[in-house]
Structures are given as structure tokens and as C-alpha cells.
A protein has these predicted regions:
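Catalytic cysteine-centered active-site loop
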Residues: 163-177, 181-219
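Loop/turn positions that initiate beta-strands
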Residues: 9-10, 80-86, 221-222
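Boundary regions of SH3-family modules and the immediately adjacent low-complexity/disordered segments
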Residues: 1-2, 11-13, 18, 25-60, ...
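Residue-level "contact hotspot" at macromolecular interaction interfaces
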Residues: 5-6, 79, 215-218
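Short, flexible active-site loops
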Residues: 135-137, 156-167
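Active-site loop architecture of trypsin-fold serine endopeptidases
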Residues: 162, 167-168, 228-230, 243-250
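Catalytic nucleophile-His microenvironment captured as a short glycine-rich beta-strand/loop
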Residues: 224, 229-239
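Aromatic- and glycine-rich peptidoglycan recognition patches
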Residues: 41, 64, 71-77, 204-212, ...
Length: 280
């Protein structure tokens, strides 16, 4: 999405044709503009059937090649990044599974690079779209503890990635892109930008003006820390993971809120605005 966001292969959008550029509305409620030639037109019925079938999988590795055959020597047809959606077919061989892409291409991907998709496109056709995001729950059968553990594990997979404004991919990602992708990969759609937005599940559990010592009392692994124009994920023991465009870092790393820790960032510790949680 021009200058603001990144939409991946296999993701659904609603769109309105405005010529060379089209206005799109994503399945997570974000609006923007895309070039017309980047869209593969599908019907609403196609989207609903895909959701109902339940065989959409998401790429979990930084990158995964789609191969003509089920072997490493086969010809590469496409390279997909973390977050791309594919339709998983029944055919498996040598640790590979056959997948079908939204553009009709079919090939093989290592099964280890995929996981069942947990989020939903229902916002795009639901009757109560204004309530859709706040009424989401964590994946069925998951405990709060499991969800928190999974989002932290997923977030750590972005450590070392370079910073890219508006990015959400393993080859370049911004601060809100990291936390958005981590929650999406674990079945919960949050607001894409670095703030808490009404109508989404993230709610404030601490605000600027309260005692700083309460941050560590209230925040748990997987909760989010918000600054003005910046966001990170709380881990434990005062540490947080974030992707920063700071000239000395320019990427995804871990820092601390605790003065005296080697990775303490005084500027961020003193400027914290809000702590948010989907379990508030």
C-alpha cells in the first residue's frame, strides 16, 4: 500500500477502481492505494469459500521457495515471504506439500515452512464489521499463557531484520509492522499503526502519569509498549523487542526499561506513553 503498508501474496482486499491506482480496504481495516496491476480479481464468494474450506496456510519462514517438484533441485517457480497465504493441497512428498497460489500457480513448499492460517477475512463481508475486531478471540483451545508464549516466540523471529518504513516483511519491517504481523500470525488482528485505535482489541492497562514501577507490575509477555510514533513488545524483566530506525540500530532488537541494564534506552524509558493488552 503506497508509502504506508505492505500487503502480501494471497491476502484479500476490497477495492474500488480509480484508474491506474485503486483504493483498497484490507481484511484488517486499513485503507490505502495500490497499483491496479498488483491485484488478482476474485469474487466475494471465492473469499468466503476459501475461509470456509479452512485449508489456507501461512508462510512462517522468512522466505520459502515454491518449487516445480518436491525436491531441492527442482525449478523454482516463486519465492514467498513470511506472512504470504497459500492453499495447501493433499499431495505430500519428501517433506514437501503441494500448494496453490492465488494467481493459480501450483508447486511444492517444505511443510516445515507453513502453518495453518489463524486470522480471518470475515471483516470484509461481515454484517457487523464495526464490532468485528473487538469481538475476536484468541485461537480456539488456546490459553492466555499459550498465546503470550507464541507471540513472543514469533516476535523473536524478526530479530536482526532491517528497518523499513511501512514494511511488514522479513527483508524490511517497521515497528508497528512487527507487532501487527506477530499478532496476525497468532490469529488476532490489531491496528496496524503505532497507537491504540478504538474498535480494536488492544486496550490501555497503563498510561503516562502513573508510577513507572507499575509498568512491570501490569505488563506481561506479549503486551505492547507505545511511545509517540513508536511501538514495541514487552518480553519480561523490563525488556522489550522493537524495530527502530534509530541511526545506531536501524533494525529489530531488544532493549530494557531498567536503568543499569546494558541495553537500557533512557530516551524510550522516559518517554513511554501507554502499555496495551488484548487481555485487559
Amino acid at each position: 500500500i503506497r508509502d504506508r503498508d505492505e500487503v502480501f501474496f494471497g491476502w484479500s482486499v476490497m477495492w474500488e477502481d480509480k484508474g491506474e491506482w485503486i483504493e483498497v480496504w484490507t481484511h484488517y481495516g486499513y485503507r490505502g492505494w495500490m497499483e491496479r496491476n498488483l491485484i488478482e480479481e476474485k469474487s466475494r464468494e471465492w473469499m468466503e469459500e476459501r475461509e470456509k474450506a479452512g485449508n489456507t496456510y501461512v508462510v512462517t519462514r522468512g522466505f520459502a521457495d515454491v518449487m516445480r517438484g518436491a525436491r531441492v533441485q527442482a525449478r523454482m517457480l516463486e519465492t514467498l515471504g513470511r506472512g504470504c497465504f497459500v492453499e495447501k493441497m493433499e499431495e505430500t512428498e519428501n517433506g514437501y506439500c503441494r500448494v496453490k497460489l492465488a494467481n493459480g500457480i501450483s508447486g511444492f513448499v517444505p511443510e516445515a515452512a507453513l502453518r495453518k492460517r489463524l486470522d480471518s477475512d470475515r471483516f470484509l463481508w461481515g454484517k457487523s464489521e464495526e464490532r468485528f475486531f473487538v469481538e475476536q478471540g484468541i485461537p480456539e483451545g488456546w490459553s492466555e499463557e499459550k498465546f503470550r508464549r507464541k507471540v513472543v516466540e514469533c516476535a523473536k523471529g524478526y530479530l536482526g531484520c532491517q528497518y523499513r518504513w511501512g514494511g511488514k516483511a522479513a527483508d524490511g519491517i517497521d515497528c508497528s509492522g512487527v507487532v501487527f504481523m506477530v499478532y496476525l500470525m497468532n490469529g488476532v488482528l490489531i491496528w496496524r499503526d503505532a497507537d491504540i485505535r478504538e474498535g480494536y482489541p488492544m486496550k490501555a492497562i497503563w498510561r503516562e502519569g502513573e508510577e513507572m514501577c507499575l509498568v512491570e507490575e501490569r505488563a506481561k509477555a506479549g503486551d505492547l509498549l507505545f511511545w509517540r510514533g513508536h511501538v514495541g513488545m514487552y518480553l519480561e524483566d523490563g525488556r522489550y523487542l522493537h524495530c527502530t530506525g534509530h541511526e545506531k540500530v536501524f533494525g529489530c532488537r531488544v532493549n530494557s526499561l531498567r536503568r543499569g541494564d546494558e541495553d537500557f534506552r533512557e530516551d524510550l524509558a522516559e518517554a513511554l506513553k501507554v502499555v496495551g493488552s488484548v487481555f485487559s
